[in-house]
């Protein structure tokens, strides 16, 4: 690590800063570190196949870059359209090798910055860096703030129309001109925009090849587009409000009143901000983002046109206003990260007594609600041939050649993964329906293998053969809980967000 920092830290003997990534491309130990990074990376229990290719070698990247600069411009290959003229070899294979090596090297400054920022919190309770990568870490962030807000902007982030925009975005982070020239040469030589984005429809997906390299470029581009929110958020907000649920208890109520008096005594203008501040709340996952506010519809409409003009002017994008939708939180549900999220009123009754008179007060408290979308889940199961489009379980013929234990293990793994990911659902009834479909599909697959009916097979083998499905949701209750519950029964009934979910496999991949 000291060798790496030597290229990235300023030199005390000169006025220039090293900050050079290009020399690292030709250092032997970099590829050894990259290899160890790929093997020792923390994996989610949902990520069964890391996708690490044992035939891949980072040492080849050095030789490829050398050949790129020693190319013969008079050499032409006419036999294979997928071969690069100056390499004479498979173009997609070499592009993957170079992109993976370059992606690891260009991530080094960001990793060092993350380590230094986390080290500054010594003595304080913070989540570990790998927990911050969890998909579920976003939901407590939504849960704590969305109950205060009124309107939300559903935004589909536009993709860059030209590869040069990606290179220009990195100029603010990578000061090494040689690395930028190599990146520009590599992008224009190997790729076009169509190879990066597989679909230009709303909710587009990215190419499955060279994912690490492209995600780094895309995240840099999105970070640049989101940088304006940081500035505007700091300009418009000075004091956060307290959760509505906390106001039911008097100790928190008096605490908030004391805070108001303290702020009022110091700065009267800040007290006005508490009541007039629209309180923006922004969150993003992949290509979809949400901007919520407690302002009016007119304010949200202004934000909509501001974002359109911002993307058009800064990134030369023709961004249609139809990609941004204004919805009221109390009337609409949002399909976000596999959940149907909404804000609903939760009635609460409080008993109050003054002297000899007692009376009841009905309060409506806003609550962030998360539901499991049953129709998309059944569609995924039908696509993977576990059931029909109507949700009727069917057998999985392609697994009939496996052993009984392997068949049960595969079905049980899918069931556990679904229960693990959707543990934050407010209502678990949908999950038990999915569990029933998978359990019956497993039984029919086993019966098909043994050439018998489901009833005959279960009677001969015993119901304990599928016992794994009965305990699938209890086997994952050993991880981090952001919220503690007062009782064990409350843990099983409440929403649970886990901090080890980095990705979830598509059911269609189980062939």
UniProtKB/Swiss-Prot annotation:
GO molecular-function term, one example from the UniProt record: RNA binding
Keywords tagged on the record: Chloroplast, mRNA processing, Plastid, RNA-binding, tRNA processing
InterPro entries: Domain_X (IPR024937), Maturase_MatK (IPR002866), Maturase_MatK_N (IPR024942)
GO terms under biological process: mRNA processing; RNA splicing; tRNA processing
Signal peptide (from-to): none
Compartments in which it is found: Plastid, Chloroplast
Top-level taxon of origin: Eukaryota
A GO cellular component entry from the record: chloroplast
Family: Belongs to the intron maturase 2 family. MatK subfamily.
HAMAP family, alphabetized: MatK
Function: Usually encoded in the trnK tRNA gene intron. Probably assists in splicing its own and other chloroplast group II introns.
Protein name: Maturase K
Organism (species): Mandragora officinarum (Mandrake)
Lineage of origin: Eukaryota, Viridiplantae, Streptophyta, Embryophyta, Tracheophyta
Protein encoded by which gene: matK
């Amino acid at each position: 690590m000291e060798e790496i920092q030597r290229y990235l830290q300023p030199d005390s003997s000169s006025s220039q800063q090293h900050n050079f990534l290009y020399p690292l491309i030709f250092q032997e130990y970099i590829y050894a570190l990259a290899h160890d990074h790929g093997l020792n990376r923390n994996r989610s229990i949902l990520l069964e196949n890391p996708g690490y290719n044992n035939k891949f070698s980072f040492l080849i990247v050095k030789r490829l870059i050398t050949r790129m600069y020693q190319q013969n411009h008079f050499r032409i290959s006419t036999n294979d359209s997928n071969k690069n003229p100056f390499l004479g070899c498979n173009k997609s294979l070499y592009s993957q090798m170079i992109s993976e090596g370059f992606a690891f090297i260009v991530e080094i400054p960001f990793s060092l910055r993350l380590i230094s920022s986390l080290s500054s919190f010594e003595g304080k309770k913070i989540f570990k860096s790998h927990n911050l990568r969890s998909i579920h870490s976003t939901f407590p962030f939504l849960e704590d703030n969305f109950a205060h807000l009124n309107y939300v902007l559903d935004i589909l982030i536009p993709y860059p129309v030209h590869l040069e925009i990606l290179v220009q975005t990195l100029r603010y982070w990578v000061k090494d001109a040689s690395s930028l020239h190599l990146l520009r040469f590599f992008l224009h030589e190997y790729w076009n925009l169509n190879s990066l984005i597989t679909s230009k429809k709303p909710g587009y997906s990215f190419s499955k090849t060279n994912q690490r390299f492209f995600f780094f470029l895309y995240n840099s581009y999105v970070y640049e587009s989101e940088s304006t929110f940081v500035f505007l958020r700091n300009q418009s907000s000075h004091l956060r409000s307290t959760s509505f649920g906390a106001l039911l208890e008097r100790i928190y109520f008096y605490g908030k009143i004391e805070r108001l008096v303290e702020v009022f005594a110091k700065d009267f203008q800040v007290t006005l901000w508490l009541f007039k501040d629209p309180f923006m709340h922004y969150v993003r996952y992949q290509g979809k983002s949400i901007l919520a506010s407690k302002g009016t519809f007119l304010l949200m409409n202004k934000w909509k046109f501001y974002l359109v003009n911002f993307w058009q002017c800064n990134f030369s994008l023709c961004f249609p206003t139809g990609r941004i939708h204004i919805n009221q939180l109390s009337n609409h549900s949002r399909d976000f990260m596999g959940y149907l999220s909404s804000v609903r009123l939760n009635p609460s009754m409080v008993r109050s007594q003054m002297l000899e008179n007692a009376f009841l007060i009905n309060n409506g408290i806003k609550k962030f609600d998360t539901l499991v979308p049953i129709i998309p889940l059944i569609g995924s199961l039908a696509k993977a041939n576990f059931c029909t489009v109507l949700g009727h379980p069917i057998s999985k013929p392609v697994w009939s050649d496996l052993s009984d234990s392997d068949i049960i293990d595969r079905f049980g793994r899918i069931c556990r993964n679904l229960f693990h990911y959707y543990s934050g659902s407010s209502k678990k009834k949908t999950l038990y329906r999915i569990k029933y479909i998978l359990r019956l599909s497993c039984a029919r697959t086993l019966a098909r293998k043994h050439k018998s009916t489901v009833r005959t097979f279960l009677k001969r083998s015993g119901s304990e053969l599928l016992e794994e499905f009965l305990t699938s949701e209890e086997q994952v209750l050993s991880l981090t809980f952001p919220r503690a519950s007062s009782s064990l029964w409350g843990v099983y009934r409440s929403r649970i967000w886990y901090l080890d979910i980095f990705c979830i496999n598509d059911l269609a991949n189980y062939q």
